[in-house]
């Protein structure tokens, strides 16, 4: 996917089936986003990712659900409720580096796994999640020793 703000229709092989449908639609996506934030909030291996979020994850969870709905080829809830996602601009206030990027992608894949998304679909979506998360990076990284 070239533009993270566009539908993610190239994340699967069948052009008639969207990733939104492949993961099971709204109810499955809702469960995935709930699992994602529960993992982030409770698992120490996501502590840096958790630290860039405020104390209440409810708003972020709701907005991620809205965004992913449209991004995965389902209803464009975020656009309907908020307007253009402007992902990078909306994330600039939050320090996002390689650690946060990697934790975000790992947490999302773990959430999809726990919610029963099949391996083939996870494997198709993971690179698109990575590309989008990488595009969010805005923090200077220390050079490798």
Model-assigned labels for residue ranges:
Residues 2-145:
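Core of compact, soluble alpha-helical bundle domains
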């Amino acid at each position: 996917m070239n533009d993270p703000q566009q539908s993610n229709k190239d994340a699967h092989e069948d052009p008639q089936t969207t990733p939104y449908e492949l993961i099971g639609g709204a109810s499955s996506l809702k469960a995935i986003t709930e699992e994602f934030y529960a993992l982030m909030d409770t698992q120490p291996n996501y502590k840096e990712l958790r630290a860039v979020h405020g104390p209440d994850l409810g708003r972020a969870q709701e907005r991620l659900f809205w965004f992913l709905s449209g991004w995965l080829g389902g209803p464009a809830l975020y656009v309907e409720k908020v307007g253009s996602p402007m992902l990078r601009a909306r994330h600039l206030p939050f320090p996002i580096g390689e650690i946060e990027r990697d934790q975000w992608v790992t947490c999302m894949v773990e959430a999809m796994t726990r919610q029963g998304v099949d391996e083939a679909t996870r494997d198709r979506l993971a690179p698109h999640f990575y590309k989008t998360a990488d595009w969010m990076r805005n923090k200077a990284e220390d050079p490798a020793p």
